[in-house]
Design a protein with these regions (language model features):
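A short, hydrophobic C-terminal helix/tail in secreted or cell-surface proteins
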Residues: 338-343
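ASCE P-loop NTPase motor core, strongest for the SF2 helicase catalytic module
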Residues: 1-211, 220-337
Length: 343
């Protein structure tokens, strides 16, 4: 009965399909199994996971182990804000800053309910996690396509994390090959789909090269209990007319340093301009400087033609677009600068 789902402290009214997802995740956890929540973009994978974590903390109180969320760096702030919005009682920290700051944050993990870190920072800090040997209740790989290649540092690092139950969140469990699915399963339940060599021999090669339907049916039977995917058209009656999701973004170190440098220059120029001409006659100059700072926030190359670094906002935009396109959605992308079209 999915109607009796009531997680104390959850600031959200779960829809029917979300209650089903919550129960599915809880049942997997009960049997010490992992799973892939592969719902379509916009169906609330985050709130379903937070409901599970909050339920566990409610049941175990001070004895509750921390859980860890690993996501693209552009989504760390969004996860932090989602926790504050839907489960404010959970003690949560987002790992960030320089190496010394991150080490201090990692030392505080036992006193937290949720830890948020990025794939990039996990790779850098993995020796610290090994040294501390923390045991997490849940390890959640968001945008799990980041670990679809078993030979990457992302995949190797996340598999080191010691957790009772592992979940993967993705709208696209398979993008190019069955080996991607194997890699994600090797994270949530190591060994379940055998070693990579045996998996290729028994499933991937027969299915891809020989179009072996028997091998395909066997693989479907193996993975079906551990993959839950709902698309919007299946749950359309439960969705509101429009869903508004605000994504927050934090600049990377190079972009942030550039912004701070120009901010300091802008402050001096504004102070001098007002001193010489007064506020009323300085407004155009002030607006020009604000526009320059705004361009740096969007992408520094809009203002600096020789900038070769990244823009965290553009990276996040690309991730959202990829997720939407892979789910078959149509997209209307609006921007206020003609120069942004060239990015």
């Amino acid at each position: 009965d999915y109607e009796d789902v009531n997680v104390k402290g959850l600031n959200a009214e779960l829809r029917g399909y979300q209650k089903l997802g919550y129960r599915w995740l809880k049942n997997l956890d009960y049997y010490h199994l992992g799973g892939i929540l592969a719902d379509d973009m916009g169906l609330g994978k985050t709130v379903q996971i937070l409901a599970v974590i909050l339920s566990y903390v409610n049941e175990n109180g001070k004895n509750a182990k921390p859980s860890i969320v690993i996501c693209p760096s552009s989504l760390s702030l969004n996860w932090l804000n989602e926790v504050k919005k839907f489960a404010p009682s959970l003690k949560c920290i987002a790992i960030g800053g320089n190496a010394i700051q991150r080490e201090k944050q990692i030392e505080k993990i036992p006193s937290c309910n949720i830890i948020i870190t990025s794939y990039e920072l996990l790779k850098r800090d993995i020796d610290l996690y090994k040294e501390k040997n923390y045991e997490f209740k849940y390890a959640i790989a968001d945008e799990a396509q980041y670990i679809k290649n078993n030979n990457t540092q992302n995949a190797r690092a996340i598999k080191v994390i010691n957790a009772e139950t592992r979940y993967a969140l993705t709208g696209t469990p398979i993008e190019n090959s069955l080996s991607e699915l194997w890699s994600i399963f090797d994270y949530i339940m190591p060994g379940y789909l055998f070693g990579h060599k045996k998996f290729k021999e028994e499933y991937e090669t027969p299915i891809v090269k020989d179009e072996d339907e028997n091998a395909m049916d066997k693989l479907k039977q193996l993975i079906e209990p551990f993959v839950l995917r709902r698309v919007k058209k299946e749950v359309l009656t439960e969705l509101p007319d429009k869903t508004v999701t605000v994504l927050y973004n934090e600049m990377g170190e190079e972009q942030k340093a550039l912004y701070k440098s120009y901010l300091a220059i802008a402050k001096k120029e504004v102070k001098q301009e007002i001193s010489e001409n007064g506020f009323e006659k300085s407004q155009i100059k002030i607006l020009s400087l604000l526009m320059r700072l705004r361009q740096i926030c969007c992408h520094p190359s809009l203002f600096l033609s020789n900038y070769k670094g990244e823009s965290s906002k553009l990276n996040q935009c690309i991730e959202v677009l990829k997720d939407a396109i892979s789910s078959g959605h149509k997209i209307c992308l609006l921007y206020t600068s003609d120069a942004a079209d060239e990015l």
